[in-house]
Amino acid sequence: MPSKRSYKTINFLLSVLLLMIYSCGQLEVASIEIVNLFDPSDDEYSLPDTEIVEGPASGITLDSSSSTVTWRHSDPNYHYDPTHEVDYAERIYYRYRLNTATWSPWYNGINLIERQLGFWAFDTLSGLHVLQFDYLEDINYQLEIMSKYPTNIQEENWPDISFFVDVYEGTELLISPGQVFADSGGIFFVNAKLIDVTDFMGMHLDVSYDNSFMQLQNYYLESDSTDFLLQSEGQLINFVNNDPQNGHFQLDLGVAGGSVTGISGTGNIVRLVFEHIGEIGQRSITISSESSVRDVYNNSVVEHIFPGVVSIW
């Protein structure tokens, strides 16, 4: 039977062993370097700075009506790295605007994965934000993208890109803007627009939309449309068939008079004001092939008809 001295010796050795294990643990914890790249006091901290990886550059002319823009932080320390304990790429917030004074909501990669917007996504394999623009018109565009950290430190000199789209020749009848971005439950508008028309005298416009996603609240000939249409001294005559229950809008419009001339140029015809009522995502507003544009000789002059798309944040 072990003596009391043996028990004391065993207890002493166990105490020494536990102390050594504890000390090693303390040393191991102390050796871990804590990094927080969102903390300005961190040695590797960088200010928010957006780098456009792919997309139109300032001053160029696109020969396509669609474009994809991808971006990330300019500092590689903030790029996606599977060895990092914190994925900084997915936690940085971004917002953008295209030809408007209204910014998109702030979304980071985590938000975008949850929302599944379709037109704006976060690529978890590359850590890139991907934004798709469709139905771009033959006009000038200005795109801005801004970032901020979860600490609300915002980018001060964000990318501001101006580019031009030139794709089609001839008379166009289209929904403008071709891609509308709007808040869920919000009010937005589109125009039915003519581009590069010569001697315009009348038209039949047939528009369809998903009335479970949006409801037509109002329609009118806006001031710049009226200015465009009243280039001629003739009388403006219009007939409207509005069927919101079936998501259908028709307009017959003509310039009447004894010796009036046709209208030439580019301008909006009618503004359609909608309210979003459905889920988030995208839906089209289409102009049917039955729509027509006629000149003073009653010739059909429209060469291209384009729909639009509504993208809800």
Task: Tell me what each language-model feature is.
Residues 13, 60, 83-85, 122, ...:
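Residues embedded in well-ordered secondary-structure elements
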Residues 11, 36, 77, 99, ...:
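Detector for Asparagine
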Residues 2-13:
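Bacterial N-terminal signal peptides that target proteins for export
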Residues 20-23:
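C-terminal motif of bacterial Sec signal peptides marking the signal peptidase cleavage site
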Residues 166-313:
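Acidic, low-complexity intrinsically disordered segments
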Residues 25-170:
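Low-complexity, disordered linker/stalk regions enriched in Pro/Thr/Ser/Gly
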Residues 14-18:
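Hydrophobic helical h-region of N-terminal Sec-dependent signal peptides
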